[in-house]
Amino acid sequence: HGNFDQAQTGVKKMFNDTALEAELDVAGYQFSSANSINIGRLIPQVAYYVYAYAKLYKNGAIAKDEKINVVVPTGNFGNILAAFYAKNMGLPIAKLICASNENKVLYDFFSTGTYDRNRDFILTSSPSMDILISSNLERLIYRIAGNDAEKNTKMMEELSTDGKYAITDEMRAQLADFYG
């Protein structure tokens, strides 16, 4: 038995194993993933938010350029990251609200600026949210770190070795529209 975090960690290790990648390449294969660790799944989700906004406007539910709030139940941070990308592309979004369950690692991160997976893992009735390592948050961290790959890698290494990392006040200020 295992949980989502354990499975995803194993998958990521396989994806990052250059020797295994070379073996597969020789055989004419490569790894792919259909879950949200694949950016190819996230990018089309941006269109969901544009479409939903257009429908709200067309149906008279909102005025032109009126800001909306987006609430997403999230564990792996993929869908709400797509909303963040839509907002950055100009979609009028006010708040990005991460709905959490008892594991609430994202709620705590947005409240404190420290991502800490060192806690009890709680099995709930929402297993897709039973996650302590929200892998898509890495993409947001990269963005708010000024697209600094070294800084991003350092924080992800801290998460791997220490189970936590903290963002700077400057980075945290860029997350003012996120609520946990």
Model-derived regions: residue spans:
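PLP-dependent amino-acid enzyme catalytic core
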Residues: 1-180
